[in-house]
Amino acid sequence: MSLQNMGGTFLSNLITRPEFLAYTSERIFEQSAFLSSGVIQRNSALDCRAGGTRVRVPFLDYIAPTEETITSGNTWGTSGAGYLTAQNVTADEQIMTILHRGFMYGTDDLAKMGSGADPLGHVGNQLAAAIAKLKTATLIAQLGGLFGNISGSGVLGANTVNVSGTTTATSANYLTAANVIKAKNKLGERGSELTAIAMHSNVAAYLEETGYMQVQVSGTSLSSASGLNGVGYNTFAGLRVIVDDQLGVISGGTSTHLNKYPIYVFGSGVVAEGVQQELRLETDRNKPSFQDLLIVDYHYGYHVNGTRWAAAGDNPNNLATTGNLGATGSWALAYQNAKNVPLVRMLVNTPYDTGTYA
C-alpha cells in the first residue's frame, strides 16, 4: 500500500501556540554554548523596543586617580598651591548596532502527500539548533572585526597571544595550560576574570588526546577519557570549554606556514545581547501554489563591553568588507585600554590539522 498524507497535526498547527515559541527560545539557549556558559548575557539596557537602528549607552571609564601628598603649608599638591586638584572621570558611550535577520522555509501539499511526513515539522525540530548556529556565526564575525588579522590590527588586537609556529610546530605551539597563562597575563591582574575558552574541534582533540580535558559534574571534576560529550560540561585550565567548528582557520597566513586557529578566552558576560524584537515564528498558506510557509525573524545585537560600533550605517552583515561586522574599521575602543576588556584571542597550531596556507 502506498503511503499518503492522511492529515493530522502539522507544525503549522503548533507554530502559533506560545508554548512552541517558548520551547524554541529555551532550546536556543540550550543549544548555544556561548549562552549556556554565560559568555553571552541578556542586558535590557541594550534593548531597542521603542525603535531605532542602534543603541547608545553612556558610561564612565575605569578611574586611575593620581595620589597627592598632603603636607602642612601652602605649596603641596600637584597644584603647588596647597590644595587637592579635581581630576576628571572619562565619560564616553558604547554603541551597539541592531541586526535584522530572518529566513523562510516552504513545502507544498504534494511533498506532504508523497512522503507521508510534514517537511516543516522536520524544520521545526532543528530550528533551535539552526538559529543558535547562525547567531554564533554572527558573534564570530564580530570578534574577527574586533581583533583583526593575524597581526592583530583590530581595536582588541593588543589582547592577542600568537604562539603558533611557522612551517613546523611542537607542543609549545599548541593549546596548553602554559599558553593559557600567557593569554590571562595579557590582562594582568584581571586575568582571573576569564571564565570560558572557545575553540575548533581540531584544537580540542589535542586536549582530549593528552588528557587535559576535564568533565565538570555537579561540582566535581573527572578526567575526560570518554570524549567531549560527557555528562556536564568540559573544562580546561579552570575554564569552561566551548567547541564550535565555526572557529576555523584564520585567513591571511603566510604561504607554506601551518594553519593557525583562533581561540577566544572570555570573561563572564563580556558579550551582552540587546533585543529589538524577540524571535518570531509565523506560518502562512499560499493557496494558489498549495504551499505552507514557515517564517522566522529576529532583531537583536551583540555588544562586547568596552567597545563600540563605529561604522556610519547599521544592520551590517557578517562579511569583512567596509561597514560590516568583520571589518576592523567598523569598531572602536570605548575603554581607554584594551586590557580592561576581559576578552583575549590566542592563535595556535594543532597536530590534528597539518595543512598549510596556500
Give residue spans per PLM region.
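Assembly/oligomerization interface modules of large self-assembling protein complexes
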Residues: L35-R101
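Alpha-helical scaffold segments that mediate packing/assembly in large oligomeric complexes
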Residues: T107-E189, N318-A320, N324, A332-P351, ...
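Long, contiguous amphipathic alpha-helices that act as assembly "spine/axial" helices in icosahedral shell
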Residues: V57, T90-G152, G188-S201, V241, ...
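A generic local secondary-structure boundary/capping motif
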Residues: A45-L46, K184-G188, N229-V231, E282-T283
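Long, position-biased, composition-driven segments near the start of the mature protein
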Residues: S2, V57-L60, L110, Y357
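Sequence/fold signature of self-assembling virion shell proteins
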Residues: S2-I40, N162-A178, E209-A358
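Glycine-rich loops and low-complexity Gly/Arg-rich segments
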Residues: A81-Y83, Q87-T90, G121-H122, A129-A132, ...
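Acidic glycine-/aspartate-rich tracts in secreted/extracellular proteins
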Residues: I63, V203-A204
